[in-house]
Amino acid sequence: MRLREARTNYAVYRFDHQFAGVLCLQNADEFDAGTQAILHRCLWTEEVQPHIAESTFHEYAAENGIEKCRVELEPGDLYFFNTRCIHEVPPVQGNNPRIVLAVFIGYSSDDDEIFVWS
């Protein structure tokens, strides 16, 4: 959290790391799992941030051979990922709303507590 968050006035700021869990409850198209997320094999750094801010990350990824994977879930599937990985949530394609439940876990190696929020 501390790596890329400028706001310091909330409880989770004190943690160095965060991961997320996403539970798929309903897909946008009942006949197709659909892509819930795209995870890039690239951790956020200050070097990457301008490409995200300027919407040029896809070009940066292609030039640097950064792989990606599509997360396709069925209702009831749960996945966890390091939120420092560059990730995208594609627009909903289908007639139904996409419904997920997300939980976030913050932690640091120098802190005995973890923080969970949703």
Language model features: what each stretch is:
Residues 1-69:
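Catalytic core of non-heme Fe(II) oxygenases with the double-stranded beta-helix
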Residues 50-118:
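Catalytic core of Fe(II)/2-oxoglutarate
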